[in-house]
């Protein structure tokens, strides 16, 4: 799925795509269809959720989407499952599918709304993505995927392990630097102590020439 298609999903209108190929005439096959559904969702793991601001997660992390589905059609519908796609923000290509999870046929009457949660596992490489959930709706026996607005997500680099070679090399450099400065400070301190000791030594006795002294000043 390219980015141009992704932006189409972000509009207020809801684009419907049939989930089965039954009863599709050639004229209807490429014709987008719209329905009177309003779907909003937030991310429970992000208290200050903003669909335009990137949300940061780690690879393999689970997130929970809180949906609100409003049925403005003239007939009741049933919510069957949640699925969707994940789009690379740079290339616009689809990189993963959101595993379809059953909702157990939640019935939604005319002009009513329901709320439900769905957990999604993010198994992605480091980078920026668009999350595009779909809700599968059963209307008068016809199953369709109802697109929602995209959310931006950012997968963070994995935390560096203590035994990671890069981390070990950093440790070796730090240990070397600390050892060098410790040795340098120790040598400098030792030299200073030697200097103080040499300055405080008792003066040497000087032998005087007594030949010029009077006899009465000479020690007996």
Curated annotation (Swiss-Prot):
Transmembrane segments: 167-186
Membrane side Cytoplasmic: residue ranges: 187-220
Keywords in alphabetical order: Endoplasmic reticulum, Membrane, Signal, Transmembrane, Transmembrane helix
Pfam families: TRAP_alpha
Signal sequence range: 1-19
Gene Ontology CC: endoplasmic reticulum membrane
Main subcellular location of this protein, as a coarse class: endoplasmic reticulum
Keyword NAD assigned: no
Keyword 4Fe-4S appears in the UniProt entry: no
Lumenal side stretches: 20-166
Subcellular location: Endoplasmic reticulum membrane
Membrane topology classification: Single-pass type I membrane protein
Top-level lineage group: Eukaryota
Function: Is probably involved in a pathway contributing to genomic integrity.
Family affiliation: Belongs to the IRC22 family.
Name of protein: Increased recombination centers protein 22
Source species: Eremothecium gossypii (strain ATCC 10895 / CBS 109.51 / FGSC 9923 / NRRL Y-1056)
